[in-house]
Amino acid sequence: MKTVFTSILVLAAIIVNGQVKDAKATALLDEVSAKTKTYKTIKADFTYTMENKQAKINESKSGVLLVSGDKYKLTAAGQTVICDGKTVWTVLKESNEVQVNNLDNKDDAMTPSKLLTSYNQNYKATIVRDKGNTDPNAESIELIPNVQKNFIKAILTVDKVKKQVKGFKLFDKSGNIFTYKVTKFQTDVPSTASDFTFDAAKYPGVEVIDMR
């Protein structure tokens, strides 16, 4: 689960920090950014696959991400990560425990709310052809970090008509390839503050591990 969540936040960091040299890529990301800022909430259902040919690993799972401002709730792989903008609760279903941490705003540990909000010079991006992409409305952007990161590159796929992220591939230094595909994208979904806070009453007998 840590890998899943880290990869999603890396995607956020890529888009946030993606100062690009390709004019076409710049324009497209600017348009997606502007569109994203108009949403009060975003709910995305997604599937993800981790592949490592050398280690003969090929695992697939699914999840749901709900975002509202600095707050988010991610459910995937038997775990739920909840953040109210300051505190992060990681609920482990199998062991019936919740780990409590302060939100880390350093480096790539960024909140999904920072998606598409500003740019700097941490990435070089270029429009590329993705052989696996058959959607005529989709555009693929290769992003290579200019500073040291725990991944080599990412390929972001964007719907150039709807101005929405369709998915991305993340290639790390261990030979792992993480592929994420958005299967359902909803905007301005009704939500309340309780969606982004941990309620122990919903998890009878849960063990609380405060790591702050």
Predicted features and spans:
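An acidic-aromatic
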Residues: 62-110, 178-179
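Flexible, processing/modification-adjacent segments and terminal tails
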Residues: 20-41, 45-50, 56-58, 87, ...
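Gly/Pro-enriched, hydrophobic low-complexity segments
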Residues: 125-128, 134-204, 209-211
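Bacterial Sec-dependent N-terminal signal peptides
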Residues: 1-21
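Short beta-strand-initiation
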Residues: 60, 69, 76, 151-153, ...
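Solvent-exposed loop/turn segments connecting transmembrane beta-strands
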Residues: 54-56, 78-79, 175
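Beta-strand elements of well-folded, non-transmembrane domains
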Residues: 50-52, 67-71, 147, 160-162
